[in-house]
C-alpha cells in the first residue's frame, strides 16, 4: 500500500496523467507484486482506462447506428435489440467504474495526513 502511494509521486502536476513515469512504476509494481509480473506489459492505467472509454463510446455509437438501420429497415429487430442491450451493458459498466473511482477518491480525501 505504501509503495503504491509512493508511486503517485511519479506523477507531476505539470504533466498529463498519461505521462506517468512508467519505468519506475512498472518496476516497482513488479517487485511488490511478483504474481503480476507477466501482466506488466508497459500499459499505464491511464491508457487502459482511455481504451475502455473509447471502446464504450464506439459501442454506444454502434448501437445508435444500428437503431438508425432498424428505422430504415436494413437491420432486423433482433440485431437492433442485441446492439441496444450490449450498449446498455457497456454503459452500466462505465457507470460502475465511475462510481468506484469516485468512492475511492472520496476515501482518499477523508484520510488523515
Swiss-Prot record:
Its main location: other. GO terms for biological process: bacterial-type flagellum-dependent cell motility. Pfam families: FliE. Keywords: Bacterial flagellum. One of its GO terms (molecular function) is structural molecule activity. It is found in: Bacterial flagellum basal body. Belongs to the FliE family. This is Flagellar hook-basal body complex protein FliE.
Amino acid at each position: 500500500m505504501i509503495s503504491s502511494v509512493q508511486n503517485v509521486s511519479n506523477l507531476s502536476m505539470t504533466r498529463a496523467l498519461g505521462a506517468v513515469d512508467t519505468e519506475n512504476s512498472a518496476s516497482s509494481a513488479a517487485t511488490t507484486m511478483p504474481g503480476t509480473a507477466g501482466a506488466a506489459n508497459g500499459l499505464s492505467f491511464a491508457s487502459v482506462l482511455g481504451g475502455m472509454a473509447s471502446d464504450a463510446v464506439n459501442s454506444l455509437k454502434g448501437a445508435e447506428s444500428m437503431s438508425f438501420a432498424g428505422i430504415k429497415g436494413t437491420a432486423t429487430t433482433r440485431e437492433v435489440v442485441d446492439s441496444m442491450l450490449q450498449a446498455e451493458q457497456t454503459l452500466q459498466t462505465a457507470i460502475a467504474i465511475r462510481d468506484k473511482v469516485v468512492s475511492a477518491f472520496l476515501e482518499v480525501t477523508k484520510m488523515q495526513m
